[in-house]
Regions:
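A solvent-exposed, acidic/Ser-Thr-rich amphipathic alpha-helical stretch
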Residues: 24-77, 84-89
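Short, surface-exposed coil-to-beta transition loops
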Residues: 66, 104-108
C-alpha cells in the first residue's frame, strides 16, 4: 500500500482505540495478527486475544483512555509512531486498585502491514512511569531491598 494509505489505516485504527470499539478492529487487523507487548507482557496471537486480553482489560482500568501520535514514520510496509496516552485510573490495572489518578503514558508502536491490514504490532510503553504516577514506585522498592 502507499505510505498515505498505511498512515490512514493506523489513524482509523486509533479512532477505534479511542472510541473503545472492539468490533471495529476487525476492519483494521488480520485475524492472525500478533501483538508483541512491552517487556513482561509477552505476545498475544490472534485478533480475538488482542481485543479481549489486551484492549478490554485496559479499557476497564482506563475508561477515558485517549491516545495520540506525536511523530509518525511510514513506508510501503511499515508505520511507526510515538506519542502519549492519557487516561484516568478507574479500574484495577496490573494488580493496582483504582486510584482515580490521571496518567500520561509514553509509548512507541511499530506496525507491519500485509495485504492492506495491520498484521503485527510491537509495543513499547513506559509502564514504570505510569506505576509511579499511580503511587507505586518500583525503583524505590528496589533501593530498600
Amino acid at each position: 500500500m502507499s505510505i498515505e494509505k498505511n498512515l490512514e489505516l493506523v489513524h482509523r485504527m486509533y479512532d477505534a482505540l479511542n472510541a473503545q470499539d472492539l468490533d471495529a478492529h476487525d476492519k483494521y487487523w488480520t485475524q492472525d495478527m500478533i501483538w508483541h507487548g512491552p517487556p513482561a507482557f509477552g505476545d498475544i496471537h490472534g485478533l480475538e486475544g488482542f481485543k479481549y486480553e489486551v484492549l478490554k482489560p485496559f479499557y476497564a482500568a482506563f475508561p477515558d483512555y485517549y491516545v495520540k501520535n506525536d511523530i509518525e514514520v511510514a513506508d510501503e510496509n511499515w508505520v511507526a509512531a510515538t506519542g502519549f496516552l492519557t487516561a484516568t485510573h478507574q479500574g484495577e490495572w496490573l494488580g493496582i486498585p483504582p486510584t482515580g489518578k490521571p496518567v500520561k503514558m509514553r509509548f512507541s508502536d511499530f506496525w507491519l502491514i500485509k495485504d492492506g491490514l495491520l498484521s503485527e504490532n510491537w509495543v513499547m510503553t513506559d509502564d514504570l512511569e505510569v506505576m509511579r504516577q499511580l503511587g507505586v514506585d518500583l525503583l524505590a522498592r528496589r533501593d530498600k531491598a
